[in-house]
Amino acid sequence: MATRSCREKAQKLNEQHQLILSKLLREEDNKYCADCEAKGPRWASWNIGVFICIRCAGIHRNLGVHISRVKSVNLDQWTPEQIQCMQDMGNTKARLLYEANLPENFRRPQTDQAVEFFIRDKYEKKKYYDKNAIAITNKEKEKKKDEKKREKEPEKPAKPLTTEKLPKKEEQQLEPKKSTSPKNAAEPTIDLLGLDGPAEAPVTNGNPATAPALSDDLDIFGPMISNPLPAAVMPPAQGTASVPAPATLSTVTSGDLDLFTEQTTKSEEVAKKQLSKDSILSLYGTGAQQSTPGVFMGPTNIPFTSQAPTAFQGFPSMGVPVPAAPGLIGNMMGQNTGMMVGMPMHNGFMGNAQTGVMPLPQNVVGPQGGMVGQMGAPQSKFGLPQAQQPQWNLSQMNQQMAAMNLSSANASAGFGQPPSTTAGWSGSSSGQTLSTQLWK
């Protein structure tokens, strides 16, 4: 379909061009050949703009395409440009241009060779060419070009108007984007991880000593005898000072539970730096020592041996003396102040008294008296003996201390008790008064 339509269009154009050429041939000058003046020319040199006969057409072809381009009026197809050139020039104008200097008595040649020489002199050598006419023709050509430009100029401004409107619209669309972009940049960036939040301000409760104390409380393996607390971190006595519990708890929850801080490691390093030879030796000095009150009697400072007695064959030797709390077991401290604590008792109690300073000789347990008083007595719900609380005074303590010194000469391999007392693990404790009124 497309080829047919193209062919039809081409035919219509060709017909139109033939009509134009036929009109041009009807002119008086165009009825004759431009070179030999033969009648009825059917060929034309469209670049020169002249109608010629068939013989002159052959000579024009021999000149070359750069000089003359020949076409048949009826057999060839013409283009609009070629038709325009023929309309502009014609035989009359061509003679005025190419034969301006031709002599008046000049006869046109009739033979082929003479015609060829004349055609070469006329179009190739431009022997008779009017130079002034060239300027006229150039001016006419310039005028025609100007007219064509003027005809195209009103059409051209219409196109830039559309192109100018589009950039304006694009600029209007870009302006709101530019105005919105600073707003997005001005918004503060929010850290989603929350590590740099406003909660970075340190919480201070006014107690600078709580940090090392709390780090030590979190230590599972300390403080022990091999790793004692420094003097600056020693807890105060129970009866002398009272620390408010809510304040310490708040510091624990606020500071030590923070997984991203290094307070525990820093406090441990501070505590280790404070440990020195003097601070460790000061723990074993003869100064005032802390005493924990017993269950049945007041706190006392009692010396113990540095080694376990070797005469006790039924009990293993202990490397470190652990003092027993006085009064935990009824009448335990009657006269046996030098006993070793840590022996397994059937009621589950172990001693917890403070260590003393005065050493005792080995194989010495104490004067004759009950090692563990009233062990055979019926026990209470919590494993405590139902014996009455002994009443101690300073005189009895002095007597017992003197008895401890005398007992070194009477030491024996056994428990050092008469048969009446060793059999039942119960003995009379001198200087003790048992009364049931204290329990009321």
UniProtKB/Swiss-Prot annotation:
Interacts with ARF6. Interacts with clathrin heavy chains via the clathrin box-like motif. It is found in: Cell membrane. CDD domains: ArfGap_SMAP. This is Stromal membrane-associated protein 1. Residues 140-158, 165-178 have a biased composition (Basic and acidic residues). Residues 140-211, 410-440 are annotated as: Disordered. The lineage of its organism: Eukaryota, Metazoa, Chordata, Craniata, Vertebrata. A motif (Interaction with clathrin heavy chains) lies at residues 192-196. It comes from Mus musculus (Mouse). It is a peripheral membrane protein. InterPro entries: ARF_GTPase-activating, ARFGAP/RecO, ArfGAP_dom, ArfGAP_dom_sf, ArfGAP_SMAP1-like. It comes from the Eukaryota.
